[in-house]
Amino acid sequence: MAEQISSAKAEARTVRIAPRKARLVVDLIRGKSVAEALAILQFTPRAASPIVEKVLKSAIANAEHNYDLESANLYVSEAYVNEGATLKRFRPRAKGMASPINKRTSHVVVVVSEKND
């Protein structure tokens, strides 16, 4: 007999935000119920909040559509941000010199699971 799948995953790859900044937002929702996590994200004034919110909504939709899980029973079991490719640029400086600019990207991953009551 096939094992019942009780979690769903969503990820956004190569998002143009520094991983260090995105992790601040992701740390707020880890372990929370999806309703509470969405509320937290809507009132968090950080650039990463809408990105993480979109990934969370995608994970919830994946759970409902692909695995027939009830969204009321879901919580954020895993949420992490990995470093993506870095875009390297240069800023011209005085005396013909240049300073490097690293435009960092992130891979945002959110996994939602059913609560075992």
Curated annotation (Swiss-Prot):
GO terms for cellular component: cytosolic large ribosomal subunit. Gene3D superfamilies: Ribosomal protein L22/L17. InterPro entries: Ribosomal_uL22, Ribosomal_uL22_bac/chlpt-type, Ribosomal_uL22_bac/org-type, Ribosomal_uL22_sf. GO terms for biological process: translation. One of its GO terms (molecular function) is structural constituent of ribosome. Keywords: Ribonucleoprotein, Ribosomal protein, RNA-binding, rRNA-binding. This protein binds specifically to 23S rRNA; its binding is stimulated by other ribosomal proteins, e.g. L4, L17, and L20. It is important during the early stages of 50S assembly. It makes multiple contacts with different domains of the 23S rRNA in the assembled 50S subunit and ribosome. Belongs to the universal ribosomal protein uL22 family. Part of the 50S ribosomal subunit. This is Large ribosomal subunit protein uL22.
